[in-house]
Amino acid sequence: MNIKCDMHFAVTGGAGFIGNNIVKNLVKKEHNVCVIDNLNTGKLENLKDVKDKIDFLKIDIRNFDEINQILKKMDGVFHQAALTDVQDSYRKKDEYYDVNVKGTRNIFESAKINNLKVVFAS
């Protein structure tokens, strides 16, 4: 028996290495996928195989209002967006804090408001 699960998922950082693999697996299972990525480190090329099967939004997770508007339409969120370069983090402490802490807080706050489950990798 082949059951189609028609759920809507957001994947933050979906154009990155881990995120794009999550996106491809969700698409393979016939879910509706919304990729949220600001493309600072992710690449659209990573999504070329599924570009016609996803919605892509170039949004920064630090923007709570935009994130909340998107997540209110979802059944769940896979949060993979982050800045990860260790050397760069020493030079850009404030930016790394804003993205990795405040941005992640935005995802969890919106998930709480919208009663969503979050899969988070750290």
Where are these regions (language model features)?
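N-terminal Rossmann-like NAD(P)+-binding domain of SDR-like oxidoreductases, especially those catalyzing
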Residues: 1-122
